[in-house]
Amino acid sequence: MGEESLKEFLQKKTNSKQELCKKLSFEHGTPLIGLVIDNEVEDSHRSAVERFLEGTCSLEVEVVAVADTDLDSFSHPNVHYVPYSEKSRKNIMEASDIMVALPSNDMEEMLMNGVIPISHKHELINNYNPNSETGNGFVYGNANEVDHWKMFAALIRALETYKFPYDWRNIISTGLTSTHK
């Protein structure tokens, strides 16, 4: 992807984020974390997500969860719920800075939408290395062992990197190009 097309892509992403934040009535100045929770989410993963979301309350982030499952157990001031539909899924993919990837989620779709995944080990995701400035996501462990502490640690790494626009842009670019191989 050329420099101009990357600029255009990032501008569209910024506009999508602003529109979603306006629609859900919160500021767009903080990192936006997306989460797609579907019926395929195992109970152990659901429990890890609940604990993970509790931890996000102490961070300056907004979380938008698109879900087709019962969400009565989730209640946090910085977490916004949207009923699952193809349109809401598309909107969250286009708007999110970061997405928490569960084993049932589509990694390629995240990368193609310029989303930085917080992901279990996956063939499409290379753990970001700040020293060599390589990678396209932040890895938290194996798909069969979803641990909320490891997810949270990967999120903190991502949020620290988010503060550096040049590095963040490079991770997005790496993710976009990794889907075209």
Q: Which residues make up each language-model segment?
A:
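Catalytic cores of carbohydrate-active enzymes across secretory and cytosolic contexts
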Residues: 1-181
